[in-house]
Amino acid sequence: MKDKGEHYKTYGWTCSETNLNTLPDTAPEGAHKLSEWLTLQGRRTSLVEWLGQCKDDGRIHGRFMHIGAWTGRMSHQAPNQANIPSAFHGDPKTAVESVKHRYDGPMRKLWCVDDGNYLVGTDAEGIQLRILAHLMQSKAYVDAIVTGKKEDETDIHNVNKRALGIPHVTRDMAKTFIYAFLLGAGIPKIASILKVNRTQAQGAVNNFLESIDGLKELKKKKIPHIARRGYFTGLDGRKVKVPNEHKTLAGMLQNGESVVVKHWVLEWKKAAEKEGLDFKLIDIVHDEVQVEVPSMEIAERLIRIQKESMNRVRDNLDVFCPLAVSSDIGRNWYETH
């Protein structure tokens, strides 16, 4: 049997859980069973890995590489916390979703704090779309992010939905679309998200590029120029080399996210330490941090400090779009993200 590396070189794809999750309903039953099995295998592998990494103090001490990815994002090892799936919400409609519904929530609950302590989970709210607004220098996009409301359909995902120009597209479909689009998804993938044929998917992308202020110029002019030059300059002034045009926009968004989050962590930690708060930073994953504290009072004060600190980061880095955070307090990771 070929390993994944050989298989990718030969066929251009691998038989992975991620790829099999894109199977259409019309795929053979055997393919769906294989997808279910791979999902179960992945959950079992994670549990075995976690048990093996648990130390005498009952904790897992993972490793962080602060610029482990080419974009400047952190990478993680032993275990890779970035690959731990979020809990599945809603009614499972496939065998794979049933596996996720059964296991992913309980697996998140395993990541908890000491008895009596609280976990504060805070993330940089909508950070990649805010970085996109910064790159486009679009006041209209900023307004939708900052002042738009889901209730009256003026929020950013409803704005994106209307920009696609397809009547049956829902807000949730538009939300899935925008992140796939920004990561460089091809027309077949976008067609599957929007539940249209490829011609309609291409038309939707064209509509989107024309409708969103500043996006066409970013995608058609700025990104190709950056790719030809071979690098972009991040929010903190560092030059970041880009491997190719296809990965450039996603790289710029991830780099912006990474720079903002790292500056923010330094800012709120300094402020919390100055106040003498008792806290323990226990995890950073992309746009979120998890912090252990001994009381609800400290948890609430820490959240206020984190919000205030993000405002200073926006000013320090001169980000075009206002930045924001959202927080939850709980006893485990399931409750805080």
Model-derived regions: residue spans:
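Conserved "right-hand" nucleotidyltransferase catalytic core of DNA-directed polymerases
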Residues: M1-V99, G116-Y118, E125-Q128, I187, ...
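Short acidic (Asp/Glu) and glycine-rich catalytic loops that position anionic groups and cofactors
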Residues: D3-E17, M107-D115, R130-A140, D155-N160, ...
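Conserved catalytic core of nucleic-acid polymerases
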Residues: Y8, P24-P28, G62, R162-I284, ...
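Short, contiguous acidic/charged loop-to-helix segments that flank catalytic cores in large enzymes
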Residues: T22, W50-K55, A87-G90, T94-S98, ...
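Short, hydrophobic/amphipathic alpha-helical patches that form generic packing surfaces
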Residues: H32-E49, L129-H134, T176-G184, G251, ...
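Function-dense linear segments that define catalytic or interfacial modules
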Residues: H66-H168
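Short amphipathic alpha-helices in soluble, non-transmembrane regions
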Residues: L302-M310
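Catalytic phosphate/metal-binding cores of nucleic-acid and nucleotide-processing enzymes, i.e., regions
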Residues: V319
